[in-house]
Amino acid sequence: VEGRIIRKECGIGVVGQTADDTGRKQVCGVLSQPISVEPNVYAQELNNAVMAIEERINKKQRPYAGSAADELKIKRMVHQAIHGKRNSPFSAKKVMDLIHTLVYEEIKSKKWTETRVSEAIESLCREIDPQFKLKSSVKLEPMPEEKAPRLLIADEDRGQVMALMTIYCIETLIKKHFPEKGIKGLSKKDAIKRVMKACRVPRKVAKKLVTVFEGDGSAWDTTCSASIRELVENPVINHVANMVNGFMYATPETWADAHASLCAQEKLDISYTKNKEYQKETINAIRRSGHRGTSCLNWWMNFVCWHCAIFEDPELFLDPTHRYGKDVTGTNRWMNSAYEGDDSFL
């Protein structure tokens, strides 16, 4: 071992950093390219997980600080997205038209084999009332010296399957309704081309000068608290889950209900079971990194919050072609945007 590097015949490994350097060393990665500074990768151990909870969750959380007027705008926009007569991405008709075409083997992650899906479904079918079991771990990644490790919270295979039908519907409906406001389904190069073409500023607008914003959420998962998710995304999850339960007689209602119930909880019970260490923790509910819906729900959160923060009538922008609206200062403003997770381009 040379500092944070260990040399073996098969290659050069990266030693995981721990609070106690006297114990057995963990190899947490490999070097494939020359480096100028030794990497700081936190080891997979309980002390690092506890540090991640304290530094990354407890200290970074922010309460929802919207006013009553903000809350009303959010509720109005979300209600319009579900029950509106026009431009509602999650209307009952759109959900039902999509649901009857879905088969688990076809909507599973491309990384999953059919055997893995079948085993997860069979395991769930052996239980009367299956529930989510959240597992935590330390994310193995190089970090700046002063930064604490990041915590991963996984729903595991059972949770992925129970959430799959609901989340796949939401994800697909967002892609269909806002095809040019995201980058899913394309290579990076093609996605950027599509976004830049869609966000091209008309000459008439450009004459008045245009401001471009690039947004990158700070501690995004941690600040997606139960209170803001209850306003923005839980109504959509509950609406789609009810449709799934009403149509998919072959899928136990308990699956969609367990998923919707977990998303509404204010506390999360997580367990850490790695390298013969075991501990249970209860944390304030945040966005789970291993949730099947992390990507599309982050997109929806980003889209709704930006429009509600800027405009008096944000629900008008549920029409993908709508560009003008009166902002909170009373100015008639032109806006176009695209999103990916916690990143935004306006």
Residue ranges and their predicted role:
Residues 1-346:
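Viral RNA-dependent RNA polymerase
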